[in-house]
């Protein structure tokens, strides 16, 4: 596959683990300079040292909470005038599986603030530069939950449906420019996602992937890199990625233990 990404700069949010970490790693392999952000400073520093050493690229880290708009603005302003060619809005997550009549307000706020407002903030801060340069690519990490609803997912599904709408509307807003806008929407991916959703209950988290082979973070990263590496005139708007055992949000073929 032709490498069209070498020498570009990508900003990846939520890069300290899982899909974000995998995306950063695979972009680094193609010679992409990185700006990686998250809340775990030590983890970001370790990643930066390894990626710079192994791939001879520049890695900048940003330690802040994506839900803190002022912190986002301060960090982006600190980067100066160097262009960000690719924005990967990866930070997100689900908290709890409560039905709407007993949901936790704090969990709801966290999901909306992270999945929706954080994504909007980063897009608002970075897209003007892309528009001015008439070049760039915004890639949002969505979910099958952004295409289907399911029980116990009322706010997470709503948040990811919002991401789908934001992706489509952003593409429309940038019509007439050469800025590309994409979304990658995974199904079941085995990462820290379920541990966070079930608040550290490993037994419940493991059952999500029981009796089937889920996707890995690297599987999704490979798709993101593929989307980013298309020719400049090619825009993949939304790519849904399932493990072969999954056909819908709640339709999964499982084998007995």
Language-model features: locations:
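Active-site helix of classical SDR
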Residues: 123, 159
């Amino acid at each position: 596959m032709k490498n069209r990404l070498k020498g570009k700069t990508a900003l990846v949010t939520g890069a300290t683990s899982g899909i974000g970490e995998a995306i950063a790693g695979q972009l680094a392999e193609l010679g992409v300079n990185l700006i990686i952000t998250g809340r775990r400073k030590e983890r970001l520093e370790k990643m930066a040292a390894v990626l710079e050493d192994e791939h001879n690229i520049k890695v900048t880290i940003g330690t802040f909470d994506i839900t803190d708009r002022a912190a986002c603005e301060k960090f982006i302003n600190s980067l100066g005038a160097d262009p960000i060619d690719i924005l990967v809005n990866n930070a997100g997550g689900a908290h709890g599986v409560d039905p709407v009549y007993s949901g936790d307000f704090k969990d709801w706020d966290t999901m909306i603030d992270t999945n929706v407002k954080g994504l909007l903030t980063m897009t608002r801060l970075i897209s003007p530069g892309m528009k001015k340069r008439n070049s760039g690519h915004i890639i949002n990490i969505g979910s099958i939950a952004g295409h289907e609803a399911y029980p116990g997912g009322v706010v997470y599904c709503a948040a990811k449906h919002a991401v789908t709408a934001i992706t489509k509307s952003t593409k429309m807003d940038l019509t007439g420019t050469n800025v590309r806008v994409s979304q990658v929407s995974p199904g079941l991916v085995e990462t820290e996602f379920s541990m966070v959703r079930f608040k550290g209950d490993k037994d419940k988290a493991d059952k999500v992937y029981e009796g089937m082979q889920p996707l890995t973070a690297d599987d999704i990263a490979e798709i993101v890199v593929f989307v980013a590496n298309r020719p400049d005139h090619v825009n993949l708007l939304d790519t849904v990625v399932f493990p072969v055992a999954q056909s819908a949000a709640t339709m999964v073929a499982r084998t007995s233990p």
